């Protein structure tokens, strides 16, 4: 959303200063493009990054974490803040609106942790209350890293929302063929 807001603003003639806290533009899409089966998603970020690079009214700043004071010092007339999305660690999701009780001794990993390189070993249980693509993709990633995986979902189907994109049967088949236990 941040890159698209910057691109659309530049297209409308606004001077745009794009401050990126890290070294890579594209937010979640830039991270998720490295997950199994999602490499094509990189086109979303690549297109916007290219469009921004062609505009004389756009300046990009990397490793530029800003606070409110820094933003005010710039003196911009309009400010759009895209802070990115983070996966919750406490189990709050679509079906569960209160945190799950957890055992502090048991390691918990979010998709953000796995995309950052952290990885469990051995048998892993994935609780998928996203119902779209992430649970299946995380299961595939962990199988590739040598884990055995049980995917648990409260939905009727694994990656249930992918019924709308006609991908659900293929996702289920692929996970079953990899040895993912689906409950």
Describe each PLM feature range.
Residues 1-25, 61-72, 79, 83-163:
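Rossmann-like dinucleotide/flavin-binding elements
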Residues 27-29:
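Short beta-loop-alpha junction of Rossmann-like oxidoreductase domains
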């Amino acid at each position: 959303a941040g890159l698209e807001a910057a691109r659309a603003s530049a297209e409308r003639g606004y001077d745009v200063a794009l401050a990126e806290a890290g070294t890579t533009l594209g937010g979640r899409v830039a991270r998720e493009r490295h997950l199994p089966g999602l490499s094509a998603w990189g086109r979303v970020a690549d297109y916007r990054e290219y469009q921004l690079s062609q505009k004389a009214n756009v300046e990009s700043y990397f490793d530029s974490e800003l606070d409110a004071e820094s933003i005010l010092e710039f003196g911009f007339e309009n400010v759009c803040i895209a802070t990115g999305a983070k996966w919750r660690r406490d189990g709050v999701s679509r079906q569960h609106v209160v945190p799950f009780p957890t055992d502090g001794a048991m390691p918990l990993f979010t998709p953000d942790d796995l995309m950052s390189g952290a990885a469990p070993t051995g048998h892993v249980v994935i609780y998928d209350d996203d119902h779209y693509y992430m649970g299946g993709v995380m299961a595939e990633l962990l199988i590739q890293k040598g884990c055995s995986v049980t995917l648990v979902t409260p939905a009727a189907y694994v990656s249930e929302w992918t019924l709308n994109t006609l991908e659900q049967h293929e996702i289920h088949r692929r996970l079953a063929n990899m040895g993912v236990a689906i409950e």
